[in-house]
């Protein structure tokens, strides 16, 4: 199995090529660039570079794994649109991995913790883990003050941004972002063990902001008589 | 990649607004043109909601590519080049199409051409009426754009003569439709209502009429219609929807065709292309035919399916830039929400 993994649901644009072998998962090549505003520019060239770094051809890839968020939507969709098209053109299967699960896996923790990423609008996407591999319950989006941490350490960019709210040292939030190497390892293990992975479809967790319009605004100023009536 | 026997196979991808379009073209031959629209999801909001459109593009992109390839009877590995809309349009919507196009280009190891949506609206006419004469004037009218272009060469020489300074013509249609309790999008229902109306019953203002530019303005027209309807209601006069629709439509078609004909005259151009969603409007077409005939100008209007946003327009422009031997775009190109028409190809 030669699995191409990438994630664009956080400011980190990250790609890795992972291979499963008899002695576990080997990361053949990986790159990460942190730039919250250039996912669309960075991802495809980064994939090309990682594949070249590993000394393989894109046609050698047997699986694609992509971070499905949650994360800021515009960046998130860059990864998913890329994954769908690559899988279609290469004729290989594509699976999803929750971005928070990749972040949790990257932490390597063996005791319970909370992973949190920036959801913008002064909120975080977060979930609780018993260890790096095991999430408990669903991923949620809340204001940091409304996250029930139960005294557990919080990791991730969300923990770094709101360290004061979580009452911990900003430096304790590492790792801040998921890596594609972790995401790829997570996916290879799940595929090998037959653990189900999500479909490669986005976790938005919020509905689009849109208001159903009311009646058209009046363009005429109301007359004095009309104003009098409304008082 | 070009064989003597047939022109290269171009895949075109469009996602600048609410239509996910994918098409396959060889030269001026359209092999398949598939569109998935999210217009119904926007209807209750009275306009395109960017986030709703972006979500729909992601869902529709790969299935639309698959459907278009099946319809064209081609395999993706047969594709010689990929063309994609880089702008102008909605950032999040454009980014879905551009990301997919880059991935196809990388996986298939084929050149990628990032092209201009507005110039695509002109290029698409070649799929219906054959190669465009040089030069042409193009009038692009849609929900997002109202522009007059001087096209000396589709691939290399496109000049903006004028554009709307506020609302697009199609936007004015949507807003007036709402005033008249007609459904969204407003173009078709206003056109239908106007058939039974008298376009001279009310005189609505023609924005920027005779101001010596090729710019347009439709915001004042929309407000004038709103005033007229409110006044009539306040005074207890009946509002004839057909008359208001016809008079509004007359004002739009009048100013659009007058400036288009003036532009042809000034530049000594004998061919006018009208494209974009509003090009399907019956009054605009009739008045353009009439005025152009009088001025000795030939009008070319693609069939309605090609006038609205689709992948065919992008594939048609892609075929043109490939034929011109222009270099492909880099894989790190960005979307450009306000890409000027003079940038036909991004590289």
UniProtKB/Swiss-Prot annotation, chain B:
Q: Which reaction does it catalyse?
A: L-threonylcarbamoyladenylate + adenosine(37) in tRNA = N(6)-L-threonylcarbamoyladenosine(37) in tRNA + AMP + H(+)
- Identify which cofactors the protein needs according to its UniProt entry: Fe(2+)
Subcellular location(s) of the protein: Cytoplasm
From what organism does this protein derive? Answer: Thermobifida fusca (strain YX)
Q: What is its EC number?
A: 2.3.1.234
Purpose? Required for the formation of a threonylcarbamoyl group on adenosine at position 37 (t(6)A37) in tRNAs that read codons beginning with adenine. Is involved in the transfer of the threonylcarbamoyl moiety of threonylcarbamoyl-AMP (TC-AMP) to the N6 group of A37, together with TsaE and TsaB. TsaD likely plays a direct catalytic role in this reaction.
Positions annotated to bind Fe cation: 117, 121, 309
Q: Does the keyword Transmembrane apply?
A: no
Q: Which cysteines are joined by disulfide bonds?
A: none
Binding residues for substrate = 140-144, 174, 187, 191, 281
Enumerate the UniProt keywords alphabetically.
Acyltransferase, Cytoplasm, Iron, Metal-binding, Transferase, tRNA processing
- What GO molecular function terms would the record report? iron ion binding; N(6)-L-threonylcarbamoyladenine synthase activity
Q: Which lineage ranks, top first, belong to the organism behind this chain?
A: Bacteria, Bacillati, Actinomycetota, Actinomycetes, Streptosporangiales
The protein's name: tRNA N6-adenosine threonylcarbamoyltransferase
Note describing how the cofactor binds: Binds 1 Fe(2+) ion per subunit.
Stated family: Belongs to the KAE1 / TsaD family.
What biological processes does GO assign it? tRNA threonylcarbamoyladenosine modification
